[in-house]
């Protein structure tokens, strides 16, 4: 019984604390408002401020009573409480004026301050930055919102510094007025906190201004910036010289460091970033990162307890509407802040985003969570979850080791779906969002999360957990999620759920704990609330008062504020010494070389601490012996997979250890003590001998080139970049189906995790450059629309994969067609057939669109003017048949299906055309073309004696309104060739450009248009085609080039000397016997390896030789042109692979089919070359690539190291960025000095395609170009008069040896009436002149070879034609009769008043001039008599002249008969007969004599000021070069033209 009584007493005493806590009720005060959504509170006080509609109110009793602040008269935009003086000072900014109010006594009094902004605005958005020590120093920043005349909103940013409002000083950039283009205007005090190492006690200010100029014509931007520093509180500023020529994007001021980010490319806001670090604000150094950084989450940068910088890195998504978090990784610097490395536990083969939280009050403690990129949707979809795991970890030793979050909760073990005793498989998973604003405490914290293995994260299953040991172990406290906060250093915990139950009801109570989460009480609120904010009134979490804000659930919501006061708990008792215990940080282990412990209240103590967190002493005991955790790798070293520090070649090259060494090697310690570490006895570190033989010396450009090597066990078979300027992302696929993704040009590569599913094919969307599709072997398709940062997984239809490519809509990113096999248990089964499946939602759902379809096109999205925007065309191959048909539909074959052709060979689309190959009789083909999807027209090929049957043709592309086509004329395997044809604008009428153009058995043709330049094409012809066709000789290839889109061709002009300065063996003047020949398209391993680049204008590489024919590949050398093919230079002996970078500013060559350890590069457009050794052992380089736009400075090499076992396949990323001193300056207006100038290409300073064009080229090789779209800024100096080179031969005409277009014998010209069918509104057409203008030409006036002759009526329009050109007899008759009547009346009047009245005609010869015998009674009589006298005078003179002429003629006639009377000869009629007896089709032969066109006004539109003799002469010379030895042959009308032509002919000779 005594024992029972004792136990009872003990139980009573244990119950007392709980009963006391249950009996306590916090003081809760409610405040309602209709206009305020937030309430501002002063630290550790009952004073609250809120803004009503027209007034500002204050409460000094936690919201029980409110009164209006009379000093504040205007509407307030915002309140700001001074973060360093939160107990007393606050600012209230006025919305409608540049004005704010200040209180220094917790709102009891306010004083106004007016900002001296002169510009008027409708709204002002201002904020303030205060100094942590100097109270009177303020920085004011205002955004001005005004409405301009155009109605557009304009934001101007202005910054002022002030000494407590006594005076204001505006801060301005030096580059001009702050306007709407200013994207950044920011100033901050260097000293960011009271314990900051920077700035001392002064008021130094750092300011950044950044201006962004938008180039509307190209869609690009130009950025400029200015970073300035003031050491006198804002009175004077000076620019930081180190950043003078750089674009500073942002900066961040931390406790120990200032971080400045500079944009690598001022013309690309998405370009990579350099990170500059300083600890004294005077000297900045570039930090080393694993790869180039593009997007940094500046607001989340912080320092850990030893001063290391934690740098979150993200990327921007292309889809602005997506709510998916941005991709990210977290880098942590060394203790010097100069070398960054990623967190070591993050999966290196998975893409996702990372959250890292660092509670600053817990030294050495980090929380991290990794979340794979998977898009979620509430809609039902056929997405399977990508099996990549969530991971959540904690570290208590500064990130050296990490562990899972262990759940220790025996009472609730049944609530978890896994065994929590095995934390490696079952642990707490969370996102750690709430830890960023965690209130300080001695290891007490709460988070929301779920318990599992990380394979799934269901937000609906989230619960709330608590930890008392800084996150090492956790316990469940609530089965829901909500808002929580702590007070009194963790001894008071408040929690309110977002929903009170599973039905989603609004919470009507909150929960609280007074024993660090062990037990919980609850409080019923007067009014339910949608909670959105729960905070302690003291920022460091040491107070006992809280503010809860939210909205009501009424139809007309009102804002609710609850003020909650726990200060009376435990009868206001404060803790004494016996109420505390020691709590060891990190379980008592050494952190930063010391052991740390806090004194915290015991869990069941009945008291409050009532002290600020900073007043709690953190006991620090240095550790005696240093261990490996106290060290980090020296700058030149990195940790390997085992954790050992090993030398890094790139870091050694960046450091100066070898520059300082006098020998061939240098001794370096691989470990260095972490800066600020407290351990007493250092470890003994053995130095490592680093060879310096291959390390580039200081001043060498090779020192600045950075190479990164990656090793693979299997060969990379496929690789392709995403064609965007956002970054350098690419996808690679190896020989066993593993996919890899890189976002930095191959520098860092991650394997794409498919949970064991092999990738069998990768397809890129040709219309949306950020999209790609990876086909899995198990029926999944992995889709990305953001360059591989995130993927969705779609389940393909239940059909066999046939390996057929997807077909995409050109206008809808999520719409494409997939082809699968039905009834294909065996691919050889006769029932196996293809089915086209359509998706419009990016793969969420597929519908069966068309059975037996093997190729479809979204035709309505391809044409410029489609007959129907929704039109789809499909090629259908029926089961048990080899026949293929072409069908179309405008509703995806639901109800509409139309057969276009019953039998086709195939079809394709190019440049706004669809071309169908249709079988014809006698095993021939016919081509039909459409440019609207409705009307198909047969393509008319020219008659030619060397064209037999139309057996095969290749579409080579379509540009500028013409289709280029290769029509095979010889199909014998290994000896294929044919004619190169070009169409008219609608693709239906073709003319021959060149004969015997080489092709291979696969249909590929040696044809390449030079990218970026108009009308330049290179082909290889079979020079001995006749003998090859007769099987008498092997092919002999020669290379030809055209500069006017195929109208004229010539051989390539060879260089005079080779790369070694020696003359070539052949030096004939005739290009037919000695020219440059290049291997072409038919021999390429990768068809993407073109001669030219669209961004390196005028530059082309080629492998070939100088001679009379093309030699085998291995016997050739490498040649370069920089003027579009006019002149060439041999740059290297032997075949090389090439690549362009920086728009041609960097050229790179690597030997082909030979092992090497070096590349050759040029930064002066190929004038000089340097070698760079990129690896230690020689490798066979399979390919060299860069971004499709050739604008990057990074190149990626794929190599194979022979006989090296595992990892013999390598990639090398070579970065040239650092060899350039700066970025080239470009001024679009041309008003300022820039590093570019306009110049013509080569010596072709005359006209080409009817205009003179100049191109931009950089002038300084020390600068790099970047993302300037140079090709967009080429300019046409002027349009030119038309010449022969602006025309090509029309259909059924061919170019003769004299340069004229002649009609093919036996044929007639194109039927001009065909145009009447295409344009029904026409009433007339014209016959062909034999010439047609080249579509690219813009010439005006001059020669008019295509001039039309007499018009003909269109069939059926004869009446309209006659009406247009016939005379209107009725109208003309009326006019004629009217004129006759007028003449008759005048004549009668003159006769009656002037002749008859004065005696009639009998006196006619008696009247003399001046005779007064005529009757003149009035003015009318005088006028009539004057007319009579004038008529008499004229008649006498005419009569006299006639008589004299008659007499002279009679005399000449008699003399002529006397001299020639007996001679006979041809009469005029016989001469006329000879003219008219010419052959009937002689009209067409007029095309043979171009003089007939000269009379049509060849110079009719040339103005005197446009005539430049030197340019005209040069134009003629250029024409002759383009047309070999063909003279222009145009007889001129003027002496100047005759002299020009004479000069041309003499030069031709």
Curated annotation (Swiss-Prot):
Membrane found in the keyword field: yes
Cleaved signal peptide residues: 1-21
Cell compartments where the protein resides: Golgi apparatus, trans-Golgi network membrane; Endosome membrane
Disulfide bond positions: none
GO cellular component terms given for this protein: cytosol; endosome; endosome membrane; fungal-type vacuole; Golgi apparatus; membrane
Chain ranges on the Cytoplasmic side, renumbered to this chain: 1391-1549
Listed transmembrane segments: 1370-1390
Ranges of Polar residues composition bias in the record: 1489-1501
Membership in a protein family: Belongs to the VPS10-related sortilin family.
Protein purpose: Functions as a sorting receptor in the Golgi compartment required for the intracellular sorting and delivery of soluble vacuolar proteins, like carboxypeptidase Y (CPY) and proteinase A.
Protein name, entry field: VPS10 homolog 1
